[in-house]
Amino acid sequence: MTSLPASQAWLYVRNNSSFLVKRNGVQFSREPGNLTQLNTYKSSGLCNDKAIDINLDEDGKIVMALKAPKRATKPSKSLNKTPLRKNFRRSAKAIQSQTAGKFYRGDLTGKALARYAALHRFTKVQQGLAKKAKTKTGRRGAVGDDDEGMPSLT
């Protein structure tokens, strides 16, 4: 099976895509592999052979997915997903080594790091909001907690 050339695929996808979102005269794209979320040929994850996607999974964890050019004819198997569970610096270094080490476009590394930083900041805020504040319901022996006004049993 032969694959469609990237430029021809873009002609089909650019105006008609299930990932396309048009708001206030600007076209956005929610497709996997599109780091900038703009509907352009350069940032399209569907049309390019090598693409990077950094997103949250169902559990709220950050996952990096790399599109493998070897599996271009099998879209369901073309993404290699890697969870980014380490601290910020190690995960950023993993993103750099995966993109630069496998000869992805140079501009994708900076965009991937920017997206990872934004998602990392978002998850930290979400973790902070998820914690409930501890409230003390009452203490024994606190001031005003003696049994005034109660009849004595003795």
How would you label these PLM feature ranges?
Residues 1-154:
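Compact, Lys/Arg-rich rRNA/RNP-binding cores from ribosome-related proteins
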